[in-house]
UniProtKB/Swiss-Prot annotation:
Subcellular location(s) of the protein: Plastid, Chloroplast
BP GO terms, sorted: translation
Protein name: Small ribosomal subunit protein uS14c
PANTHER family, alphabetized: 30S RIBOSOMAL PROTEIN S14, SMALL RIBOSOMAL SUBUNIT PROTEIN US14M
GO CC term, one of those recorded: small ribosomal subunit
Gene name of this polypeptide: rps14
GO molecular function: rRNA binding; structural constituent of ribosome
Species classification: Eukaryota, Viridiplantae, Streptophyta, Embryophyta, Tracheophyta
InterPro entries in the cross-refs: Ribosomal_uS14 (IPR001209), Ribosomal_uS14_bac/plastid (IPR023036), Ribosomal_uS14_CS (IPR018271)
Organism listed in the record: Glycine max (Soybean)
Job description of the protein: Binds 16S rRNA, required for the assembly of 30S particles.
Broad class of where this protein is predominantly found: plastid
Amino acid sequence: MARKSVIQREKKRQKLEQKYHLIRRSSKKEISKVPSLSDKWKIHGKLESLPRNSAPIRLHRRCFSTGRPRANYRDFGLSGHILREMVHACLLPGATRSSW
């Protein structure tokens, strides 16, 4: 299980990303529309002034129950071994074990 501080840090990043999402998106659209290089640099400086953790690339998908950052399934929001345990315990409706 991931440390609580790591999970809280990830939640803080998600809040920052949501807060600055529209500003970041509008600035990127402006850069593509503006023809002059000096104006592009000004807009780029505005983008750089935003908090670093507000960038969506810094987010990690984490397991809902354990906080594990690797081997996550998007559909369930769980890591692989927790997903397997829950399927074996019949806790996920519609998920079946493969057998051949």
